[in-house]
């Protein structure tokens, strides 16, 4: 909307400002709901991950004690990306988390459960990074 108005050399109209306000309000709602449910999202994601891949918690598995922290960090970065509408913060960290074996997909599944199920379409693209 902004780039289109700029290309035309126009100020934003009231309708365009209202549309932008609605987008920002939705993003704030998403971030607030994820933040409010972050502990449950990560707990449920970890539980699901370990049920699906019990070898992670077996001796020699990849479930180090900092795994929950890593999952929380991924979720925090998703909130940054959601509020900004820009997933580059996730792109910058993707290789690091993949190398560490951090289960971002499990956090994404956690968002899809419980009170956050309506947020899935809003944040799904950020978890695909």
From Swiss-Prot:
Its main location: membrane. It comes from the Bacteria. Pfam families: Phycobilisome. GO terms for cellular component: phycobilisome; plasma membrane-derived thylakoid membrane. It is found in: Cellular thylakoid membrane. The modification N4-methylasparagine is found at residue 62. Two isomers exist. InterPro entries: Globin-like_sf, Phycobilisome_asu/bsu, Phycobilisome_asu/bsu_sf. It is a peripheral membrane protein. Keywords: Antenna complex, Bile pigment, Chromophore, Electron transport, Membrane, Methylation, Photosynthesis, Phycobilisome, Thylakoid, Transport. GO terms for biological process: photosynthesis. Heterodimer of an alpha and a beta subunit, which further assembles into trimers and the trimers into hexamers. Belongs to the phycobiliprotein family. This is C-phycocyanin beta subunit. It comes from Aphanizomenon flos-aquae. The lineage of its organism: Bacteria, Bacillati, Cyanobacteriota, Cyanophyceae, Nostocales. The gene is cpcB.
């Amino acid at each position: 909307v902004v780039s289109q108005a700029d290309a035309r050399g126009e100020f934003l109209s009231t309708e365009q400002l209202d549309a932008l306000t609605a987008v920002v309000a939705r993003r704030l709602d998403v971030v607030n709901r994820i933040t409010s449910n972050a502990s449950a999202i990560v707990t449920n994601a970890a539980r699901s991950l370990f049920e699906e891949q019990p070898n992670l918690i077996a001796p020699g598995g990849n479930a180090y004690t900092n795994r929950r922290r890593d999952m929380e960090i991924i979720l925090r970065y998703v909130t940054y990306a959601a509020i900004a509408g820009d997933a580059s913060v996730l792109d910058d960290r993707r290789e690091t988390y993949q190398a560490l074996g951090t289960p971002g997909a499990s956090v994404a599944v956690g968002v899809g459960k419980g009170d956050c199920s309506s947020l899935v379409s809003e944040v799904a693209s950020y978890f695909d990074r």
